[in-house]
Amino acid sequence: MAAPKGSLWVRTQLGLPPLLLLTMALAGGSGTASAEAFDSVLGDTASCHRACQLTYPLHTYPKEEELYACQRGCRLFSICQFVDDGIDLNRTKLECESACTEAYSQSDEQYACHLGCQNQLPFAELRQEQLMSLMPKMHLLFPLTLVRSFWSDMMDSAQSFITSSWTFYLQADDGKIVIFQSKPEIQYAPHLEQEPTNLRESSLSKMSYLQMRNSQAHRNFLEDGESDGFLRCLSLNSGWILTTTLVLSVMVLLWICCATVATAVEQYVPSEKLSIYGDLEFMNEQKLNRYPASSLVVVRSKTEDHEEAGPLPTKVNLAHSEI
């Protein structure tokens, strides 16, 4: 069994420190007890070792070399995965099989080592999936919830102090209404400052009367109660309303931009042709005035086909004539 040769190959190919490789080489001959120290770094290979024990039981295979070769294949796969950071498990398997080929010369031991690499592959995939599931993931609605939390904090800080006033309506016997209104007073939030006992008693006594907020003296109690409830509900749920309005505004703006670009008329400016005789052509164009089609008169004469031309005049010899 050429264990030193395999350790040398792993050290040169994978770049591991010699102390770690020496410990792993000793672990190949001492069983699963020494490999437990590297479970936290290289991953757990106990499941792969149990698969090797089921494949090569000692009562069927008296020789322990094949069992140790299979278990060593599990550890070699973990070492290769640790060096490659688990990027490509198929590449890790090929490197593990190459290390087994270099480490063992006999075919039975090589096959057992390759089987260990193959047995460790599904456990490595399962562990990688578990690690990926533990990583934090951002939900799609996280930006909306973040904006809502900011808005809620701002509204809570704005509602920490509010102004309030109380108003009394008294109706006399003659039908006249007398209004008593107090000046606005600042009231702090109950969770920030506890109210004294006398203020609580006065607030309980004031609730027996018709009370209005925001200093509106010419509205009745029912109308003010409905408006107050609506405004309070709006202030509590304003985060979602603001977020929805913002998202819809952005979508409408993008739609307007896309529609404008798609329906815009192409602006084409013809290029001016340069010519040596450009000035002369310009002058000729200015001098020539074309007549309109309405000013042209076409004159046609009727010709008769049956009429023949008249006889030619007689020839006169000028030499025999006397002038």
Curated annotation (Swiss-Prot):
Keyword terms of this UniProt record: Autophagy, Cell membrane, Endosome, Glycoprotein, Golgi apparatus, Lysosome, Membrane, Phosphoprotein, Signal, Transmembrane, Transmembrane helix
Task: List the Gene Ontology MF annotations in alphabetical order.
Answer: endopeptidase activity
Sugar attachment sites: 90
| UniProt-reported outcome of changing residue 272 to A/D | Does not affect ability to activate LC3. No effect on interaction with ATG16L1
After translation, the protein is modified as follows:
N-glycosylated.
Upon changing residue 268 to W, the result is: Does not affect ability to activate LC3
Top-level taxon of the source organism: Eukaryota
User: Does Repeat appear among the keywords?
Assistant: no
Q: Name one GO cellular component term.
A: lysosome
A Pfam family annotated for this chain is BSMAP
- Map motif ATG16L1-binding motif onto the chain: 263-281
SS bond list: none
Q: Domain notes, please?
A: The ATG16L1-binding motif mediates interaction with ATG16L1 and promotes autophagy.
Q: Which PANTHER family does the record match to this protein? A: TRANSMEMBRANE PROTEIN 59, TRANSMEMBRANE PROTEIN 59-LIKE PROTEIN
Query: Function, please?
Result: Acts as a regulator of autophagy in response to S.aureus infection by promoting activation of LC3 (MAP1LC3A, MAP1LC3B or MAP1LC3C). Acts by interacting with ATG16L1, leading to promote a functional complex between LC3 and ATG16L1 and promoting LC3 lipidation and subsequent activation of autophagy. Modulates the O-glycosylation and complex N-glycosylation steps occurring during the Golgi maturation of several proteins such as APP, BACE1, SEAP or PRNP. Inhibits APP transport to the cell surface and further shedding.
Please give the family membership noted in the entry: Belongs to the TMEM59 family.
Protein name per UniProt:
Transmembrane protein 59
